[in-house]
Each structure stands twice: as structure tokens, then as C-alpha cells.
């Protein structure tokens, strides 16, 4: 039996640990909070992040990083993007053999503009990692914890590693596909949080279904524009980690990013929203990173730019919506039309 370690005991890490134990694995969950580990080991629950879900006794918690990662065959990183470097640096000295690393977070590092797998390639020496795999898709932890049907994608530069992770997680409640396009998978997973924030804002403003449908559709267009420019496969954005993740994150009350946007739409200040949420809202940091990427790659991302104005420059949400609706007219399939015209020339 493989030793599987989960770095992070938030809602998603806990839900995935449950999937793994349903498949007959023992999982060691690491967290820095002793009270959280006590809940997992003694009460077999995680009231803080995944309430009302009974955890398997095969999930063992620890605050000791050496105990967690020593001799691990698979190490799953389930911490927010901003904590990944620090957690990996804590783990590396205690890793005793090459492991497959799986990350399940969705974000881009501001300033460096690195995807999470790129951060991991930098922080993990070649003598401790076999491969890096991303597990992503439309998957709320609350529903996974209740064993509702869920489908995700495992992506890696190594299809062997992606298939290994597919086999580790797949069961009758949790279906896993593979996809070699790690760039597209990571970009889709990260940037959908931006559109979810914007969708929450339109709902908070009471704008209704028409506005949300337009936002999701045009949001997908700018995600695909940037992702393709960065080297992703355009088809990936029509899959689970593109349109699939976008739909679930923009329409569900489980979505932290949607809930945060909803409060912004109702007039709350950003700092008050983040305090009210009490958990990481990845879309805020990702908006800053995506805005920087749009400039770097010279890609039009009007929704991202409008949200950036709201979050970081104090623009009113109503003004941001008005600016989007007042943009100059263009063709819906502008990129395709331009490509076709260039080919004709």
C-alpha cells in the first residue's frame, strides 16, 4: 500500500482525504493547527472547514512535518497559493525518497506570475520529486464530502503520472479524466475565480440571469485567450477545467469567490468582505496576477481589468459594469475573425 500524505487540512484537502480512504488508502494529513489535528484524530471530523461530514479512522492527522512526508509515495499539496512555497520549504528536508507530487489549489502567484506547478518545480529538488500532477475541475468540497457525483481532471507533463493519480482517486462517486495540457488546466482553474467574483457582484447588484450568462460566456472567452497565448490547448477551456469549473464556481453558494463578489455587489468594502469570509478568496490575488499577465502577453481581458479597478483602485462596482457595457462594438468571435483574415491575406 502506498503512503499518501495530504499537506493541508482545509475543506478541499479533507474532502480528498475522504475519497482516498474510500478507495482503501490510509492518509496522513498535515496541518500546523493542533486543535484541527485533534478534531481529525479524536472526533473524526473537521468542524472548521468541512462540518457535518464524518471522517474515516484511516485519516490520521499530524502537526509533525517529518512524520507526514517521510517515506511518502504521493504528496498532495492542498494549501492556498500564497502558502505553497513556505510549506514546500518546510517539507523538503524531511522527504526521504522520490514522490509524486499532486497539487489541488487554483491560483497564480502575483509578481512572479508563475503557475503552481512552476513554483513546485522551483521549490522541489529533482531528487525528491518524480512528477508533478494537477488535480482540478468543478468540485465543491462540501459535495465531495457528501459523496455526490463529481468529475475532475488529472493533468501532468507525464501521462504515466497523471494515470497513476487517476487510479488513486477514481471511484463510483469521483470520476477522474486525464489531460496532458497542464498549462490550460491550471490557467482555467485559476482564472475562473476571477469570473466567479464578478458573477457574485452582478448577483449582489440584482442584475439577474441575463447578466450572469453574458459574464460567464465572455469570461470564458478571455480565459481562453490568455491561456492559449500562454501555450494552453484551446480545447481544454471547453472541458471540465474550463467551462465546467466556471459554471460551478459562478453559480453556487458553496463558492467562496461568488460569495465574496456577492458581498462586494451589496456594497461591502473588500477588507470587510475578506474578514467576513474567514477563508482564503483566491480570486482576489489571482485578479492581480491575471491583470499583470494580460499586459505581459498583450491579451484583451476587459472583465479582469474592470474587476482589478474595483478591487485595487476603489472603483464602484456599478461604474465597472457601466464601463464594460459601454465598450466599443466588436465581433463576438473577434479572435477567430482576425485569425481568418490574416490567413486570407
From Swiss-Prot:
Active-site residues from the entry: 192 (proton acceptor)
Pfam families per UniProt: NAD_Gly3P_dh_C (PF07479), NAD_Gly3P_dh_N (PF01210)
An MF annotation (GO) of this entry: NAD binding
Record's GO cellular component terms: cytosol
Annotated binding of NADPH, by residue: 11-12, 32-33, 106, 141, 256, 280, 282
Keywords for this protein: Cytoplasm, Lipid biosynthesis, Lipid metabolism, NAD, NADP, Oxidoreductase, Phospholipid biosynthesis, Phospholipid metabolism
Reaction it catalyzes: sn-glycerol 3-phosphate + NAD(+) = dihydroxyacetone phosphate + NADH + H(+); sn-glycerol 3-phosphate + NADP(+) = dihydroxyacetone phosphate + NADPH + H(+)
EC assignment: 1.1.1.94
Activity regulation summary: Does not seem to be inhibited by sn-glycerol 3-phosphate, in contrast to the E.coli homolog enzyme which is very sensitive to allosteric inhibition by G3P.
UniProt: sn-glycerol 3-phosphate binding residues: 106, 137, 139, 192, 245, 255-257
Function summary: Catalyzes the reduction of the glycolytic intermediate dihydroxyacetone phosphate (DHAP) to sn-glycerol 3-phosphate (G3P), the key precursor for phospholipid synthesis.
Record-stated family: Belongs to the NAD-dependent glycerol-3-phosphate dehydrogenase family.
Name this polypeptide is given: Glycerol-3-phosphate dehydrogenase [NAD(P)+]
Source organism: Bacillus subtilis (strain 168)
Taxonomic lineage: Bacteria, Bacillati, Bacillota, Bacilli, Bacillales
Amino acid at each position: 500500500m502506498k503512503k499518501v500524505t495530504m499537506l493541508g487540512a482545509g475543506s478541499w484537502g479533507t474532502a480528498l482525504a475522504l475519497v482516498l480512504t474510500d478507495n482503501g488508502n490510509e492518509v496522513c494529513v498535515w496541518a500546523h493547527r493542533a486543535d484541527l489535528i485533534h478534531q481529525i484524530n479524536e472526533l473524526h471530523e473537521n468542524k472548521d472547514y468541512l462540518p457535518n461530514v464524518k471522517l474515516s479512522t484511516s485519516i490520521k492527522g499530524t502537526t509533525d512535518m517529518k512524520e507526514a512526508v517521510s517515506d511518502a509515495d504521493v504528496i498532495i499539496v492542498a494549501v492556498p497559493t500564497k502558502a505553497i512555497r513556505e510549506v514546500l520549504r518546510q517539507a523538503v528536508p524531511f522527504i526521504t525518497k522520490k514522490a509524486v507530487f499532486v497539487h489541488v489549489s487554483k491560483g497564480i502567484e502575483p509578481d512572479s506570475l508563475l503557475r503552481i506547478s512552476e513554483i513546485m518545480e522551483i521549490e522541489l529538488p529533482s531528487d525528491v520529486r518524480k512528477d508533478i500532477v494537477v488535480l482540478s475541475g468543478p468540485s465543491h468540497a462540501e459535495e465531495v464530502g457528501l459523496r455526490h457525483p463529481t468529475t475532475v481532471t488529472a493533468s501532468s507533463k507525464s501521462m504515466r503520472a497523471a494515470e497513476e493519480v487517476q487510479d488513486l482517486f477514481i471511484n463510483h462517486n469521483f470520476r477522474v479524466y486525464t489531460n496532458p495540457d497542464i498549462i490550460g488546466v491550471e490557467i482555467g482553474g485559476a482564472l475562473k475565480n476571477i469570473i466567479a467574483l464578478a458573477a457574485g457582484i452582478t448577483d449582489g447588484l440584482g442584475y439577474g440571469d441575463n447578466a450572469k450568462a453574458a459574464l460567464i460566456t465572455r469570461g470564458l472567452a478571455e480565459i481562453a485567450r490568455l491561456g492559449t497565448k500562454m501555450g494552453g490547448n484551446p480545447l481544454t477551456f471547453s472541458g471540465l477545467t474550463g467551462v465546467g469549473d466556471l459554471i460551478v464556481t459562478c453559480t453556487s453558494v458553496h463558492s467562496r469567490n461568488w460569495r465574496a463578489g456577492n458581498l462586494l455587489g451589496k456594497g461591502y468594502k473588500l477588507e470587510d468582505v475578506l474578514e467576513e469570509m474567514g477563508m482564503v478568496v483566491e480570486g482576489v490575488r489571482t485578479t492581480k496576477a491575471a491583470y499583470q499577465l494580460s499586459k505581459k502577453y498583450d491579451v484583451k481581458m476587459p472583465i479582469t481589468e474592470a474587476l482589478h479597478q474595483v478591487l485595487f483602485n476603489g472603483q464602484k462596482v456599478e461604474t465597472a459594469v457601466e464601463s464594460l457595457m459601454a465598450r466599443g462594438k466588436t465581433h463576438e468571435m473577434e479572435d477567430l475573425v482576425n485569425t481568418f483574415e490574416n490567413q486570407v491575406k
